[in-house]
Amino acid sequence: MGKYPDCFPDNFEKDILPDGAQENSRRVYRIIKYDEKISRRNFMSTYEEVQLKLMPKPKRYNENEPSTYSTSCNTELSKIRYFLGLCMKHRPRAFIAVGTTDGSCGVSQLTSERTKSNGGHVDWWVYADAEPQIYFEKVE
């Protein structure tokens, strides 16, 4: 298993990371909101974005919630298109990429496996030294 970002709390793996998260490969969609190309920077977790002051703390920000430390993806293109519409208000050059949550880059889990949510949202806890961008391409 790889190492998580240094900014993550010391108890992240023991107390926060869900037991069901595994190094697997799922086909997912991701909103690319930084830069105009698919780069490593576009695969940061919400926690990292807040720490780097790239975004304000969300209203429901909870440092004990596993999804705070994940990179959000979705298995359903229609759902990611909806969120792209919301995102474009603040990031007009954002676009959608498709790829895989390659296990060498981190563990992932369908959010619905641990919450009452439904749908194809995937939490992906990306390792600090991973290069997830190489597994993605722009959706035309």
Where are these regions (language model features)?
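Conserved NAD+-utilizing ADP-ribose enzyme module
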Residues: 1-69, 77-140
